[in-house]
């Protein structure tokens, strides 16, 4: 069973999907978890998760190759 770890979070689903796409372009599997409250959509975040084995590389990509 693969353990997943958060490498990015944001209130915007678009930014989370962009981060996911960049990670996947670099052969890092990624998923977006919607942690938003389902009723009012004002609380919570979108989290980008990667397998634990890819965390260091993913964090490096997020910090150095992605700007918003």
Where are the language model's segments positioned?
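Acidic/polar low-complexity segments and flexible, solvent-exposed patches
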Residues: 1-68
